[in-house]
Amino acid sequence: MRSKVLSLLLVLVLLLATFSTALAQAEPFCGDLDEADCALLTTATENMMDVASYTAGAEYSAQLIGLPGLPLSEASVNVMVGGAFAYDDAALAAAQQLGMATSQEDIAALMSDSPELFVDFYNGWSFDAQIDVVVSEELAAALSADAGVAIPTELAVPLILKDGILYVDVTELAPLMEGGAGMEGWIGFELGRVIEAAAEQGAFEQAAASMDPEAMAMAGGEDAATAAALMGMAAAMSDPTAFEEFQTIVRADDEDMDGMSVAVFVTSFDVLAFISSPQFVDLIMGLVDSGALGPDAPTAADLEQGMQMLGLMGPMLFQGLTSESTTMVSVDEPSYIVGQSTLFSWDLAGLLQMAAMSGAIPADEMPSGESKIEIFTSVLNGDFNEAQEIETPADAQIVPAEAMMQSAETN
């Protein structure tokens, strides 16, 4: 059971790391912004990499409504994370180096050549946070039936990380864990020492090697084509500058946030232009040539025909699609990124109408109401470089690193 807990803990920590201020993109996209606006955005981004302590609140939500073939009329998940965060000097330096990695290859190189960065980051990073998860009733019922255990619609998991020990209040989490019945209160896991041991034993080098698309495909077994396709797509899209020609950024009207003047930058992605571009064709053909899409992959002739159809029907198919991000920057010096959000929303009405007309979807499977996919993320930052008091729970039971590693080896 502890090996499963270890995997879960790593996922939780990685989730919290996704909105680390020091991991901000090194060079923001400026597009056609004027010099002053680009300088403001760039300076704020650079300042974020020197933030040693702050508070943050994040929201991640996904919603599927009225999709043909989906056994649920609606499935929604909302994850909220809030807390205080701090880094010591070594962790901040490590985070700055990790933040400079802009591609899958960069990350793999750091894992292979500098595993100590990950050790320094986790041993010197502290936080006191809570993760709140809310799922729709239909989805909770479906998950419960599949898992054979009652999945609640709401779940709260308090977390504290300090001195390399991750403390988890398992009171609400325990009923969902195998063998967790009766567990409650705080449990501390020596995660920092586990990461140190993993680095010493070459686990990071092995993980870096497994990030190679060919290795992923070989490890995928029967699903090797899918694994290779996913890795190929990730590699193709790992360069943040590769698709800038399909992006636009504008400075919208400034806003007031708790008495602070905030500049608002909105970046949009032109999906229709992208899928009509040579870059999109090259991306797909690269996957075809690699064999990642399997024996039924489209041929060059298929792609040419498909591109012609997209040119005719694309506006109808994608008229309900929005893909944009918003960055909020404090205007007064020192400027910081006080908020970021992303939105992918697709009203599928046009696509489903066309599918019904072609006979791809039977009339009796067409949704009667709204049909859409929406994914939203938001992060708000504050209290930059102010002292954050992060205390460890006094009554926590500690699980030693040796016990965690021994359990992982036997499972």
Model-based region annotation:
Residues 25-411:
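Subset-of-secretome marker
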